[in-house]
Amino acid sequence: ALSWYLKDPRDVYYVKSPKSFLGASGLHEIQISFFEDLVCAMMANIKQQAEKSTQATITDAMIGKPINFNGLGGEAANKQAERILINAAKRAGFKQVLFEFEPVAAGLEYESTLTKDQTVLVVDIGGGTTDCSLIQMGPSYRGKTDRASTL
């Protein structure tokens, strides 16, 4: 894809990390639709492969999300990105779509080893985002569905 793009950038869409664009400011509806189509195709493929592997219908999706999708757009960028992900997941066949902050998801395994509450620095380096978060973790936080207040 990169070599095609370099030959003629006017004729090819080249997106290295789609998630990093989901919260971009100034996107037109056609661009938002393009990203939704792209994410939907990826989710549908993953869903199909998982259903084939498990021989079961999968109706729920838990999606990791960075604390902020795009530093410049603030909460509007986060809402735009979440809307794209929800629409794509529903179109891919998921009935229930839930989100978890990526640094929380990254720290959950470690939290299961803690015997007392403490503040933990979780560094989550992904394909398009990096989150460094101080998170309250430990026995009294386990099982809480909303961890936003612990960040």
Name what the model sees in each region.
Residues 1, 5, 26-29, 33:
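A near-ubiquitous, low-amplitude feature marking generic local secondary-structure context
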Residues 1-12, 18, 56, 63, ...:
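Oxyanion-binding/catalytic loops of NTP- or PPi-dependent enzymes
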Residues 28-48:
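Adenine-nucleotide phosphate-binding core of ATP-dependent small-molecule kinases
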Residues 43-51, 108-111:
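Generic structural signal for well-ordered alpha-helical scaffold segments
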Residues 47-61:
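Phosphate/pyrophosphate-binding loops at sites that engage ATP/ADP/AMP, CoA/4′-phosphopantetheine
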